[in-house]
Amino acid sequence: MYSFFIDGMELPIAPQKLTVKIKGNNKTLTLINEGDINFLRAPGLTEITFDAVLPMLGQYSFANGYRRPDSYLNKLESLMTDKEPFRFLVSRVAPSGRLLYDTNMKVSLENYTVTEDATKGPDVTVSITLKQYISYSTKTVTVVKPKPEKKPVVQQLSLIHI
């Protein structure tokens, strides 16, 4: 059993498919007469995509009770406009109840598309794209100028001839 949480809000139906794309940042360079070489770099930000079904009618059994699709859509809109990262969690549990593993990542909502298709009933489908968010901050550095070295004062003596 899968449970999906977006900023603490559990999706009513776990998406059928979850795609996690880990972007490589390696750089390929072509050498004269030597072919290609690959410079290995740290991976890029992870991108997560899935389609969430938001039931229009409360005819299903839900863990936390029925919520109308507009409550989920309002949450997605606020995540987009607030410009703040949030937690995305996927909990995977075996039929025996044993926890398999989790995906727990700080993300941003990159985009979402709302689709209503009359051929598929009254439910709303939302295609969601999330991107991994890595916290960063600026650091203030104070540059201290070194004090000039004190050189010993040498007095010049003049010799007087008698």
Label every model-predicted segment.
Residues 1-160:
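Compositionally biased, intrinsically disordered low-complexity segments enriched in polar/Pro/Gly
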